């Protein structure tokens, strides 16, 4: 049951790492932003290896839903852009899909 917690931590690491590149290339932030960005992306990759899954592809697929919702939280909390009803609806659909992949019975 620790997988959802790992996914949330991985999502924060991935989004922060990608945002460092976004900041450098699109917002004019200094090049040194890339160092914490790369460390954050390395932490993201490491965290996904800790997920309880027998197949990497399944771990990545179920992570996708968490990533999408975490991106919407980032949108609101860091970029000060409130998600609209379509963002929220899409996020809910993605979470349902991630739950099916993560906890679906395997035969």
From Swiss-Prot:
InterPro entries: UPF0060. The chain crosses the membrane at residues 5-25, 31-51, 59-79, 85-105. The keyword Transmembrane helix applies. Keywords: Cell inner membrane, Cell membrane, Membrane, Transmembrane, Transmembrane helix. It is a multi-pass membrane protein. It holds the Pfam family UPF0060. It comes from the Bacteria. SUPFAM superfamilies: Multidrug resistance efflux transporter EmrE (SSF103481). GO terms for cellular component: plasma membrane. It is found in: Cell inner membrane. HAMAP family: UPF0060 (MF_00010). Belongs to the UPF0060 family. This is UPF0060 membrane protein RPD_3084. It comes from Rhodopseudomonas palustris (strain BisB5).
């Amino acid at each position: 049951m620790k997988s959802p917690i790992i996914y949330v931590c991985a999502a924060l690491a991935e989004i922060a790492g990608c945002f460092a590149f976004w900041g450098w290339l699109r917002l004019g932030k200094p090049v040194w932003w890339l160092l914490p960005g790369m460390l954050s992306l390395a932490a993201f990759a490491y965290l996904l290896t800790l997920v309880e899954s027998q197949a990497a592809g399944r771990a990545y697929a179920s992570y996708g839903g968490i990533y999408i919702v975490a991106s919407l939280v980032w949108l609101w909390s860091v970029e000060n852009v409130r998600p609209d009803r379509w963002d929220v609806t899409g996020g809910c659909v993605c979470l349902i899909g991630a739950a099916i992949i993560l906890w679906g019975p395997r035969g």
